[in-house]
């Protein structure tokens, strides 16, 4: 490939990316208030996820299954984890938009102490949502690699350890999920228990 052709490819990629982000900005959701949060959240089975990421569950699985049966069971578990991580990442995006709107909102008729506490809660949610989305993106990439290369019976690689998905570098699922849930609760409390409960129920899996 000549230098001229390479330059054209780079320019095409840059223009495509610019158009993608431009259209994304035009089609983004308007200022997301707390009333716009519950209806857009997707239920997630966090309890089952935590069980799958538990090292004790991993040990039991390896002791009870071997070979093809183990790899097939791991593929099922990885697809389950991927589905719920996608939902969690979506939810974190919704919560991030909410926190952005709250940080821009002007607080009228309240003390300076209350206003600062309110903004601090919004900042905590903003930070927690960003961290969780980063963890989810890295974990989803890791799951894709495992599904392709580590769970195929014809590829001579050791089966993966699902508990390793509990952390990506310094990002730990249990800590990040707890931080995100706590931040949602803290900010939601400023709107009263009814609004707070509505958001948290939408965030949890249906019983």
Residues covered by each model-derived region:
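Cytosol-/stroma-facing membrane-proximal "stalk/adaptor" domains immediately downstream
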Residues: 100-207
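Phenylalanine-focused residue identity feature
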Residues: 6, 21-23, 29, 40, ...
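Membrane-proximal, non-transmembrane interface segments of integral membrane proteins
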Residues: 31-103, 107
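N-terminal signal-anchor transmembrane alpha helix of single-pass membrane proteins
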Residues: 1-38
């Amino acid at each position: 490939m000549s230098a001229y052709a390479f330059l054209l490819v780079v320019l095409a990629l840059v223009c495509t990316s610019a158009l993608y982000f431009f259209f994304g900005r035009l089609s983004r959701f308007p200022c997301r208030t707390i009333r716009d949060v519950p209806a857009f959240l997707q239920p997630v089975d966090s309890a089952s996820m935590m069980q799958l990421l538990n090292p004790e569950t991993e040990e039991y699985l390896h002791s009870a299954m071997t070979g093809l049966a183990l790899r097939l069971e791991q593929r099922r578990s990885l697809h389950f984890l991927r589905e719920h991580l996608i939902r969690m990442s979506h939810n974190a995006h919704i919560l991030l938009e909410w926190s952005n709107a709250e940080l821009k909102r002007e607080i009228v008729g309240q003390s300076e102490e209350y206003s600062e506490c309110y903004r601090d809660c919004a900042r905590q949610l903003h930070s927690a949502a960003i961290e969780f989305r980063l963890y989810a993106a890295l974990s989803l990439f890791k799951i894709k690699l495992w599904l392709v290369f580590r769970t195929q019976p014809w590829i001579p690689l050791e089966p993966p350890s699902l508990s390793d998905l509990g952390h990506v570098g310094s990002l730990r699922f249990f800590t990040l999920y707890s931080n995100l849930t706590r931040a949602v609760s803290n900010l939601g409390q400023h709107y009263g228990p009814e609004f707070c409960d509505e958001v948290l129920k939408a965030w949890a899996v249906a019983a």
